[in-house]
C-alpha cells in the first residue's frame, strides 16, 4: 500500500511541518477543493508559520503525488476518462462527468467479480487509502467544477469501508459537498447499512441490484453477499427514509438476461411505495463477455413502463462509451500494452 497516504498520516505530516489545528484545517480545505495548500491561509490572521511556509513546496509535491495522470481520454459526450498512477505504480481510473461530477475508485481491482464488469477479472490487488480517494476528487476539482462525487469507479466501497467513510467525512465538511451529492455505491453489504447511519456525513445510497431474481443475481454478482433483493430494498428504504433522499437502484441492461417483462413486473412490485429511483444503464461492452445491450427503444420502453407503475426510472446513457469508460476497461488496455512492450 502507498506509504503515508491515509488522511490521518497526511494530517500528521502537516503537524510535523508546524501546522497548528487551524492551519491544518485550512490546508486540507484548500487541497480537497483543488486549490494550492495555502489558498485559505494568506490573510494576516491565518498566515502560516515560517517553518510551515518553508515546507510548503515539499508538502504540495507530496499531496499532488498521491495520484498522477498517466493518460486522459475525452469522449464525444464530453466525458474525460483518466488513467491514474499511484505511488506504488498501481493504476486506477477516475471519470470526470459532463457538468459537475466525478466518479472515483475505491480499490485497485475488485473482489466481487461481476460478470459484466472488467475490473473484477483480476481480483482485488489492494485497498486505496483515504488520502488516495480524496486525491482523485482534488485532482478533478483542479480541472473542473465538481459538485457531485460518485463512488462507482473501480472497487466495492463496502470492502474498504473505513477509508471510504473517512474520505466522505472530509469531502462533506471541508470539501463543501452536499451529503446527497456524495453517492456511496454498493452491491449490498450489511456493514453498509449499519455504518452509514452512524456517520456525521450521510451519503446518498446507490444499490447495484441488476435483477430481482436471487439465482440470477448470484450468477451476475458471484461474490456479492447473499441477501434477497426484497431484503436489500427494505434495508435501503430504512436508510432513505432517515436521510430524506432516495435510494438509487443501478440496473445494467443485458439483452435477454434482465430486460424481460417478468423482471419489470417484479421490479415495479418490489419498489412500489418505496423512496427509490431506478437507473437503467446500457451495458458497456467487455472483451470476452457474452453480453449485449438491448436496443435503446427497448430500454426506453422499460423506463416508461416503470413510470406507468409509479416507479421513478431514468435511462442513463453510459458515459464515455467511446473512451472505454466502463469500470476497468482503460486500465486493462494499459496493462495489455505494457505487457506487450515487455514481451
Regions found by a protein language model. Name each.
Residues 1-89, 237-245, 253-343:
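Auxiliary Fe-S-binding modules of radical SAM enzymes
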Residues 91-93:
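Short, mixed charged/polar active-site loops
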Residues 96-97, 163:
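Residue-level structural signal for beta-strand termini and adjacent loop
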Residues 97-131, 139:
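Canonical Radical SAM [4Fe-4S] cluster-binding loop centered on the CxxxCxxC motif
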Residues 111, 189-191, 214, 320-324:
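Alpha-helix N-cap/helix-start and coil->helix boundary motif
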Residues 135:
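Cys/His-clustered metal-coordination modules, chiefly Zn-binding fingers
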Residues 140-309, 314:
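Conserved AdoMet/S-adenosylmethionine-binding subsite of the radical SAM
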Amino acid at each position: 500500500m502507498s506509504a503515508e497516504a491515509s488522511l490521518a498520516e497526511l494530517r500528521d505530516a502537516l503537524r510535523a511541518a508546524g501546522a497548528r489545528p487551524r492551519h491544518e484545517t485550512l490546508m486540507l480545505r484548500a487541497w480537497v477543493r483543488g486549490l494550492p495548500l495555502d489558498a485559505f491561509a494568506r490573510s494576516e490572521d491565518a498566515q502560516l508559520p515560517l517553518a510551515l511556509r518553508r515546507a510548503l513546496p515539499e508538502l504540495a509535491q507530496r499531496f499532488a503525488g498521491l495520484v498522477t495522470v498517466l493518460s486522459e481520454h475525452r469522449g464525444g459526450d464530453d466525458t474525460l476518462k483518466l488513467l491514474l498512477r499511484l505511488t506504488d505504480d498501481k493504476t486506477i481510473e477516475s471519470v470526470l462527468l459532463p457538468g459537475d461530477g466525478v466518479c472515483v475508485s475505491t480499490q485497485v481491482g475488485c473482489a466481487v467479480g461481476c460478470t459484466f464488469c472488467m475490473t473484477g477479472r483480476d481480483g482485488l490487488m489492494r485497498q486505496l487509502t483515504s488520502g488516495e480517494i480524496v486525491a482523485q476528487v482534488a485532482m478533478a476539482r483542479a480541472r473542473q467544477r465538481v459538485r457531485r462525487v460518485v463512488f462507482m469507479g473501480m472497487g466495492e466501497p463496502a470492502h474498504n469501508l473505513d477509508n471510504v467513510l473517512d474520505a466522505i467525512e472530509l469531502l462533506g465538511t471541508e470539501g463543501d459537498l452536499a451529503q446527497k451529492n456524495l453517492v456511496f455505491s454498493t452491491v449490498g453489504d450489511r456493514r453498509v447499512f449499519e455504518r452509514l447511519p452512524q456517520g456525521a456525513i450521510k451519503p446518498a445510497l446507490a444499490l447495484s441490484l441488476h435483477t430481482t431474481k436471487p439465482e440470477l443475481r448470484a450468477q451476475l454478482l458471484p461474490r456479492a453477499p447473499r441477501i434477497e433483493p426484497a431484503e436489500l430494498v427494505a434495508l435501503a428504504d430504512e436508510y432513505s427514509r432517515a436521510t430524506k433522499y432516495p435510494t438509487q437502484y443501478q440496473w445494467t441492461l443485458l439483452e435477454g438476461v434482465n430486460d424481460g417483462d417478468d423482471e419489470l413486473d417484479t421490479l415495479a412490485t418490489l419498489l412500489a411505495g418505496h423512496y427509490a429511483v431506478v437507473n437503467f444503464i446500457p451495458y458497456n461492452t467487455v472483451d470476452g463477455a457474452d453480453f449485449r445491450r438491448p436496443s435503446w427503444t427497448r430500454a426506453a420502453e422499460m423506463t416508461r413502463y416503470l413510470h406507468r407503475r409509479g416507479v421513478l426510472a431514468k435511462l442513463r446513457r453510459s458515459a464515455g462509451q467511446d473512451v472505454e469508460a466502463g469500470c476497468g476497461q482503460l486500465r486493462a488496455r494499459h496493462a495489455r500494452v505494457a505487457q506487450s512492450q515487455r514481451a
